Amino acid sequence: MLKMESTQQMASSIINSSFEAAVVAATSTLELMGIQYDYNEVYTRVKSKFDLVMDDSGVKNNLIGKAITIDQALNGKFSSAIRNRNWMTDSRTVAKLDEDVNKLRIMLSSKGIDQKMRVLNACFSVKRIPGKSSSIVKCTRLMKDKLERGEVEVDDSFVEEKMEVDTIDWKSRYEQLEKRFESLKHRVNEKYNHWVLKARKVNENMNSLQNVISQQQAHINELQMYNNKLERDLQSKIGSVVSSIEWYLRSMELSDDVKSDIEQQLNSIDQLNPVNAIDDFESILRNLISDYDRLFIMFKGLLQQCNYTYTYE
């Protein structure tokens, strides 16, 4: 008959998967914290601690034992299952209790409270005597059951053994924290000094830019003043030209209507805006040239009617 160990193999696979998950969780946590690490070293440390906690807490043996019981029942050996049926009244309740017990065992093992300390604390309790420095050691029900089952031995050759408890070297921990603090302080100072230099350079560039802007503004002001002077000079020149033309017009032997028309055109010149004044001068010149052209045509027609000829010299 083929022997089935599928449940036991599944339990072992779950334990191994839990270890791999612990390694992945540890390495990913170190990566998120930005801590450099050696994967082999992390793997070895996690494996050592994981094996210690699983073995010392009894979780591994508990899971494997239950898996073996199930495999035996599947193989037709119901003795273990029948023996455990008396206390397995409710599988869900028992599973929840086992889960809670396993969590407590793992938590105690991770805190350095090994199996020896847990058994001793479960077997004995201490009762203080009021008013005295001594105390009474009391045996618990578990100790009584162990005595009845013959699980208690007396070691006549007592050898004091040092209990293996994880201790914390606070001095080295403080030195590590101090080194980390100094390293962080050094990085912060470097960043601050770099920021100060950068801010100083930006300030210098800003001052230089302000100086350039001030120089450009001064140059713009000079050009504006020069432009205003040119505009005033042009306005003055335009006014003097208009006055000179008006004076010259009055000295001419022209009819009053012609003088009045020319004066109106001169008075329409915009003396405040040189650009408009030039346009007005252009219009007046065009009108004068047009009048001269019409006058020449009239004179030419008159000569032809009188049978005269004309020449340009």
Swiss-Prot record:
Gene3D superfamilies: 3.30.70.1610, Nonstructural RNA-binding protein, Rotavirus non-structural protein NSP3, N-terminal domain. One of its GO terms (cellular component) is host cell cytoplasm. Residues 170-234 are annotated as: Interaction with host ZC3H7B. This is Non-structural protein 3. Its main location: host cell. InterPro entries: NSP3_N_rotavirus (IPR042519), NSP3_sf (IPR036082), Rotavirus_NSP3 (IPR002873). GO terms for molecular function: RNA binding. Homodimer. Interacts (via the coiled-coil region) with host ZC3H7B (via LD motif). Interacts with host EIF4G1. It is found in: Host cytoplasm. Keywords: Coiled coil, Host cytoplasm, Host-virus interaction, RNA-binding, Translation regulation. One of its GO terms (biological process) is regulation of translation. Residues 166-237 form a coiled coil. It comes from Rotavirus A (strain RVA/Monkey/United States/RRV/1975/G3P5B[3]).
